[in-house]
Every structure is written in C-alpha cells, then in structure tokens.
C-alpha cells in the first residue's frame, strides 16, 4: 500500500486531504503542530497516524519521518498567514511565516528525499495560494511565501524529474477554513461573487485536486489553481 504523508493534517485542507487519501486507498500519516484534540479526532476517524511536529524545526521533521513508513506521496500543506500592512509586520512574524511556509517544505522534502531517490520514484505536492500568483494587499508576507512555493515547485520538478520524482502544487483560492474564520460573512459573500463560479471553495475541493495530482503520472512542475476562477 502506498504511503502518503500530509503536513498540517489536523484541520482544514490538511484534514480533508487525510480523509481523501485514506478514501483513495493510501496508508496515511500526518504531522500537526499543536492541536492534539483535533489531530486525535482525525486519526480516530481515518485510522491515519498522527505525529506532533513543527515543520519549521528541521530535526523534529527528521525525527518524525524516521518513525514512519517510507513516503510515496508528500503533501506539504502546513502553513500560516498574517494579515496586516507591511509596515506593521514584525521581523519575528516575517521570519516565522517564511520558516513554516517555505522552510517547512525544505525540511520535509529533504527528510523524505533519500528514500524517493533510492526508489527512483515519488510525488511531492506543495500548497501555494492564488495570492502567490497575484499578491494580496495587507498580506504581503503571506503572498511572498506562497510565491516562493510556486518557484520552488518548478525548480524541484526540474531537479528531481530525472530521478522519477514528480513535483506539483495546488493554489487554493478563498477556501472556507479557520484561516478565514475572522472574515465577515458579507466580505466572504463579496469574494464569492468575484469568482466566475459564484462561490467559495471547501477543503474537500482542494483535497480532490491533491489526489488527482498524486495519480497523474505524466504531470510535473505544474500549478493547479483551485479558486473557482477567481484568478485566471
């Protein structure tokens, strides 16, 4: 049975990915930072193994991966955001966003890569954002990290393709998760109307795209927008 490792799997898009990959027949493990109760609930529901780990900590990632089966599919979903003017972002906030959103991918890829290289096969799916494509006012740091994810995805696809390893990413639009929990309902409604499909997305919408990319054997270096047409 193929093994999928999903980061940030205790809630939102990550939890939906755990469910989707389990339903698709994968053995699934997931990393989570601190929400023990949510992680336990997802694990009990799906049978997936949960490991507490901050992906910004390189050694913690290596230790976590060493406890798990070899990874066939790595889903780099863990991410955080910050809303505010660029002049109001502290150095610590800036550094933390890059440490998690970009550094976390670096650490997780390097942790699973030796086994993938040995097998000459593997699949890596990163999570960017439509704001990584076009930028968002008051989300400069978040947009910058997600733009970096897009560039990293393409570079890794070039580098790892000759070794049989595919690297792609998904770029969610407005998805109804905890990340938008503080957005006023009327603002969410306005955002929905800006998308040609006239609605906001769900975590399951993104998870379905991830499962597709995991099985798309001739697709690499691509960004799959999941945004209802918000950004074309």
Where in the sequence are the language-model features?
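Active-site helix of classical SDR
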Residues: 109, 145, 153
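Catalytic Tyr-X3-Lys loop
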Residues: 80, 87-106, 121, 125, ...
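Substrate-binding pocket helix/loop in short-chain dehydrogenase/reductase
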Residues: 85-86, 93-98, 180, 187, ...
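Alpha-helical segment proximal to the catalytic Tyr-Lys
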Residues: 114, 158-162
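Conserved glycine-rich cofactor-binding loop
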Residues: 10-11
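C-terminal substrate-recognition "lid" of short-chain dehydrogenase/reductases
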Residues: 106, 199-226, 231
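Residue(s) in the substrate-gating loop at a strand-loop-helix junction
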Residues: 129
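Conserved glycine-rich Rossmann-like NAD(P)H-binding loop of the short-chain dehydrogenase/reductase
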Residues: 24-39
